Amino acid sequence: MHVLYIMGQDSGGLPHYTAELANSMSEYARVTVLKPNETSADEVLRDEITVINAFKPTDISMQNLFDLKLDVLDSIRGLFSFWNIKLINQIDPDIVHDPTDEFPQVNLFSWVHSVYEDRPYVVTSHETKHGGAGGVLRVVNPLLSLVPDFEKSAAIVHSADQRELLLNNHKAVDEVHVIPHGVYSFFRELDYDEQKEEDKHALFFGSLIPPKGIEYLIDAVPKVSEEVPGFSLTIAGSGSIPDECADVVEQYSDVINIRNEFIPNEEVGTLFSRAQVVVLPYRRGWQTGHSGTLSIAFAFGKPIITSEVGDFPELVGESGAGIVVEPESPEAIADGLIEVFSSDSALDQMSNASSRVADRLSWEKIAEQHFEVYQNLL
């Protein structure tokens, strides 16, 4: 079997997802990856995978859309470079899979070149419903609806709730399969500066965009600092911190350390090894099937404080890997952190549970489930 993956994004976690899936699938099939010239996962792809640098990078990401930081000309060049999706018909794989959330340029040029007509075409939907249709999404969503769609042979989602949403809202898909998001264990294998775990230290990691709810975590800092002596917080990722958080950030500058930049792969392990707890204060309304940050937290066996969104209650709460709190509530986040830091034995139990989840969501097991889907489509 020959599987071709389309990497529709050059930055963030989606290239990592594609690389991990391609690497593990190479144990079962011949694998080709069609990707932009430079991505955040280039060093992750195995040598045995055929890599074709077919596209130019785009400046389009959720972060840049929210921050209105787009280089229009570069973005247009990048988008139109996906014309090279036509290469799929020359390569002629048995399966085509877009695991990067159906970006519009991938859908458009897959439709233009009819790459779905002679072979099964699979997509992975990491986000099945975007909440908060205000702001930039009020403009973007109607534009996306203009992109031609076509019948997909199968869709992969990460939770049963996502499957139901997709079946109700996505007309152009034949079947929907639930396959969990694999754990990003490759970060542990990189050459990074491992740190001793720091007592009472929490980490927020990822793009600073509105759905991530960073303001609720920052607003929780005063209460946690009062109740937990020695508490500290690192916020690591590129994007914008809301202006209304400025007073708390300034007042608690000895508690909050902000690295407002893209974190290179080789520095991710340093941040996670140092953290005692990882916090995901995500907003409600964003139907996330998983999170790259959550995947990394599991890989490092970290206890997790997360909002009650998507399948986080099952992955974190029911597994015992952490505490699930009410979304958009600084008070709830603060109470969760205070509870976690109040018991060393609870921290140890959560850490062990987090590591068990990592074993259950290994990419070897995830690839096996994908391979079964592919086989049934042929």
Curated annotation (Swiss-Prot):
Pfam family, one: Glyco_trans_1_4
Record SUPFAM superfamilies: UDP-Glycosyltransferase/glycogen phosphorylase (SSF53756)
EC number of the protein: 2.4.1.-
Highest taxon, organism lineage: Archaea
Disruption phenotype: Abolishes formation of the tetrasaccharide present at 'Asn-532' of S-layer glycoprotein Csg. No effect on 'Asn-47' and 'Asn-117' glycosylation of S-layer glycoprotein Csg.
Keyword list, A-Z: Glycosyltransferase, Transferase
Stored Gene3D superfamilies: Glycogen Phosphorylase B (3.40.50.2000)
BP GO annotations: protein glycosylation; S-layer organization
First-tier enzyme category under EC: transferase
GO molecular function: glycosyltransferase activity
Keyword Zinc: no
Pathway entry: Protein modification; protein glycosylation; Cell surface structure biogenesis; S-layer biogenesis
Function: Hexosyltransferase involved in N-glycan biosynthetic pathway that takes place under low-salt conditions (1.75 M instead of 3.4 M). Participates in the formation of the tetrasaccharide present at 'Asn-532' of S-layer glycoprotein Csg, consisting of a sulfated hexose, 2 hexoses and rhamnose. Together with Agl6, mediates the addition of sugars 1 and 2 to dolichol phosphate in the tetrasaccharide.
Family membership: Belongs to the glycosyltransferase group 1 family.
Protein name in the entry: Low-salt glycan biosynthesis hexosyltransferase Agl5
Natural source organism: Haloferax volcanii (strain ATCC 29605 / DSM 3757 / JCM 8879 / NBRC 14742 / NCIMB 2012 / VKM B-1768 / DS2)
Lineage: Archaea, Methanobacteriati, Methanobacteriota, Stenosarchaea group, Halobacteria
